[in-house]
Each structure stands twice: as C-alpha cells, then as structure tokens.
C-alpha cells in the first residue's frame, strides 16, 4: 500500500494556493485543467515529503457549500519556526485560532475552512505575544 494524496474541494483556488504556497511553503507539483468536466486539479507537496500530496479540486462556477471543514479533521505540517509561520499567516489576514502558546502547536484555517495544525520541528521556548494569546473560535 502506498499513500498518494488527500483531496480538498476549494471555492477560491487562487486564495487557497496563496495560503498553502506563500503561507506554508508548499510547492505546486502539477496541475490539470479539464475543460469537459469543468474542473481544475492542483497537486501540492512539501519539499521534505514530495510523495505525500494535497490535491486541490476546483469545480468551475460551483457555488455548492461543501459544509464544515471541521468534520474532516485536519492536515498537519511540521514547520521550522512556528512563530515565524504564524506571524506570516497572520500578516496575510489569517486568524491563528489556537496560538502556539507552548512553542509547539498552533491551528489556523485555510480559505475553505480546513483546519491546519502546525507543529514545531524541535523545541522553541514559549514567547510573547503568542504565550498569552487566547484561542479564537473553533480549531
């Protein structure tokens, strides 16, 4: 058995790509446009795990509400500096729903409300402003 990918349906492909590429540092590995089916598939991967991909599926012109992403659970990424990653995502307009108070774990949501867990690679001591930030909403 070989794990291939996790598929996520997205409403705004550009916003979602910005979140995963600029915000988290993933890279686009391939893209397929299907004119007949009216959809785009974009595959993303992290440099350290190139064979474990996320497939973004964008159905052209769809206004369908895919429901609450929290039912999905979450995607998890190990990051080299959780504070810098959270600061970058926050500067891009994303809410850090569970701040990295302990220097180890945080949660943010993608543009399509997918819960994303960020885990620190190695140890960082707690630091402000993160250490005293409360949770915001659900994560």
Question: Model-derived features: where do they sit?
Answer:
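Generic domain-boundary/flexible-linker signal
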Residues: 17, 65-67, 124-129
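Short, P/G- and charge-enriched loop/turn segments at secondary-structure junctions
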Residues: 30, 62-64
């Amino acid at each position: 058995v070989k794990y291939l990918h996790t598929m996520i349906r997205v409403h705004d492909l550009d916003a979602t790509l910005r979140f995963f590429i600029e915000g988290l540092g993933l890279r686009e590995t391939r893209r397929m446009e299907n004119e007949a089916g009216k959809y785009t598939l974009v595959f993303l991967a992290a440099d350290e795990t190139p064979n474990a991909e996320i497939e973004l599926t964008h159905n052209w012109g769809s206004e369908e509400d895919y429901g609450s992403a929290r039912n999905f659970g979450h995607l998890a990424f190990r990051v080299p500096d959780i504070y810098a990653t959270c600061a970058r995502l926050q500067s891009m307009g994303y809410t850090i729903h569970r701040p990295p108070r302990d220097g180890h774990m945080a949660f943010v949501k993608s543009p399509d409300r997918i819960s994303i867990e960020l885990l620190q690679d190695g140890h960082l001591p707690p630091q402000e402003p993160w250490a005293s930030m409360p949770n915001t909403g659900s994560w």
